């Protein structure tokens, strides 16, 4: 790889009543450039990740980054959308920009404003990330409920493991000042159906589902030569982007083949194995997604993801802490951020 992170900024996720999408973009873009010690005039390109899709009325969001400073005027700014991977996709495009030697300094921003719409409207928007020609679920939770059901049918009921994952991530979120929910709910609450923890879809309870959030984050990327002149830098060992079929009918959904391919390629590019990792952050839009990610990354064999959580491997003090941030489960899930 040829790029480094030299600065960042992050808003606390949650229901941000007083902030619209522009406010959040301007805040984190300004903060990231300040943290990096980069002048706006020196930014070569901007990539903005936001799912959009009807959450807010404002379109053409990439141009809103220019509101952060007049010296960003006329900088190329591109809107990137890739469902739940939108923020990562924006960063990937920033890495490509630097690798292609089109510029030395890139500002990447991720943002979403989700709480201004009703639950019914929200569900309709999120369901558009599924294959509507075949998958007519009324919410994205129903899609993952079907995936979780299929996994249980093949490998047995793993509700205990899902509750352990939920409890772990809620506990981790207590240590994260940017997390939307900073409350240690405990295993018993997450395991049992109750008035405050009802079934949402299939075997998934409320504590198995990530949080609807407003939020934004930004990073500044530079090439290595520029980064060496900075106060701090984090070097990219590898970055991979894969895309699988959208229709669930064209893939074995419980095998998580897309994530497995991405993990495999990234390990190969970096020249490492899973045993070399110190921690991992994986996409836990639902607790079953984290369980499947254990298998996709090679931590366990297929159908045995529960071993990782039941043996304590993925806890904060385990051999491979997973979602030490609290994950989407407690940190919140503003899609683009």
Where are these regions (language model features)?
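Short acidic, glycine/serine/threonine-rich loops at helix termini
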Residues: 17-19, 58-60, 92, 117-123, ...
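Electropositive phosphate-/nucleotide-binding environments in soluble metabolic enzymes
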Residues: 18-26, 59, 88, 138-145, ...
